[in-house]
Amino acid sequence: MLKFYQMKYIFQILDKMRCLRKRSTVSFLGVLVVFLLFMNLYIEDSYVLEGDKQLIRETSTHQLNSERYVHTFKDLSNFSGTINVTYRYLAATPLQRKRYLTIGLSSVKRKKGNYLLDTIKSIFEQSSYEELKEISVVVHLADFNSSWRDAMVQDITQKFAHHIIAGRLMVIHAPEEYYPVLDGLKRNYNDPEDRVRFRSKQNVDYAFLLNFCANTSDYYVMLEDDVRCSRNFLTAIKKVIASLEGTYWVTLEFSKLGYIGKLYHSHDLPRLAHFLLMFYQEMPCDWLLTHFRGLLAQKNVIRFKPSLFQHMGYYSSYKGTENKLKDDDFEEESFDIPDNPPASFYTNMNVFENYEASKAYSSVDEYFWGKSPSMGDTFVIVFENPITIKKIKVNTGTEDRQNDILQHGALDVGEKLIFSKQIRQCDTYLRLGEFKNGYFEMSDVNQKIPFDIHCMRICVTKTQKEWLIIRSISIWTS
């Protein structure tokens, strides 16, 4: 039998535990949610045996439902499913078929300036008739001010009626009732309350936009509502995607500013929407996108140059403050991505760390780096199949290492392939020309060379003290 003082002591302990439980509930739920998110991202990618998957799903569903944390989190046990939101169609016709690419824009009322119409105009004007058949543009008017939304819908329908009728342009709105709490949020990074509210709502705006676009196309690119596009950007994107066939990627970046020009597989959009919604109050959208990429095991940024999209807004959507950010890698005219057919690479230069030969051939922003090359050193590209080349361009050195260029070199092409124990190589070569200031370019190669090319070789014709960076090798075929 327990004595009175023992009972009193037990009740004191229980009371302390209740207080501790109250104080730790929020932090515990935060850890729980992160864990469940990771486990769902993990199991959706088929890394776990089916029996373990089912156990994890049942556990995660039970925990989330039992806590009833907030209404936003109720359905998050299935990250591959869309969020249950009833959208308002402000201007749209039914999408008759799935497109290749959806371009997503989210827009709110600005205190100064309005760039949305110019952004939509740029998307359509910079696309050819054939490209227009493969794109859809979804605009989320995310402001809760209905008068502003009505005015914007009127402007959009007047200027782009034919695109709406053709099913290329849809204007939607996610009602305020679906939004989580936006006031009284924690002030991470010591941001002022209005800034926290702005960026938190922006995360939810994009989450609902991504959720809507999950089944409209094969790929999705995220833009802001104050962006100018490069001419024929869709053709450039398709070329890049084709060049990465067989390569795992989560995010491709076609701009270096914020979340402009981030490209995703559409099948990843539900998970990304859930992710933004779950952590909406934690940090800005572009930071969350970086974490999402890492969670899905894409370690490095895959960014392409030149950029396809340029920020053009002068006044920010936050308080109308000045925003002069520009992408200095942007090019207005056609982004002529090289074909760079499949090939193998060989060099007898002393390679620095992991800057291997193949990196000079990639359209990603990386390069080959070799230590002080000697006369007679070579960098050889052997194509899987003989090709007809229209144009060749080779850049050496970088902006911050302008001395690491090929000071004395030449470029050769070969026809007949031979095999040895070490490498595949061509037995005879024809010299196309010399490098000038570390640069080589030649057009109409197919009119000057009477054979299909199986090998291409960069030769060092004089020893140099400086190291050598081959920044890019670009080949266009006919």
Curated annotation (Swiss-Prot):
Subcellular location per the Swiss-Prot or TrEMBL entry: Golgi apparatus membrane
Catalysed reaction equations from the record: N(4)-{beta-D-GlcNAc-(1->2)-alpha-D-Man-(1->3)-[beta-D-GlcNAc-(1->2)-alpha-D-Man-(1->6)]-beta-D-Man-(1->4)-beta-D-GlcNAc-(1->4)-beta-D-GlcNAc}-L-asparaginyl-[protein] + UDP-N-acetyl-alpha-D-glucosamine = N(4)-{beta-D-GlcNAc-(1->2)-[beta-D-GlcNAc-(1->4)]-alpha-D-Man-(1->3)-[beta-D-GlcNAc-(1->2)-alpha-D-Man-(1->6)]-beta-D-Man-(1->4)-beta-D-GlcNAc-(1->4)-beta-D-GlcNAc}-L-asparaginyl-[protein] + UDP + H(+)
Molecular function terms from GO: alpha-1,3-mannosylglycoprotein 4-beta-N-acetylglucosaminyltransferase activity; metal ion binding
Keyword Glycosyltransferase: yes
Chief localization: Golgi
Pathway, per record: Protein modification; protein glycosylation
GO biological process entries: protein glycosylation
Membrane-crossing residue ranges in chain numbering: 26-43
Regions of this protein lying in the Cytoplasmic compartment: 1-25
The protein's required cofactors: a divalent metal cation
EC nos: 2.4.1.145
UniProt-annotated glycosylation sites, renumbered to this chain: 84, 215
Keyword Glycoprotein among UniProt keywords: yes
Family: Belongs to the glycosyltransferase 54 family.
Protein name: Alpha-1,3-mannosyl-glycoprotein 4-beta-N-acetylglucosaminyltransferase C
Species for this entry: Mus musculus
Gene designation: Mgat4c
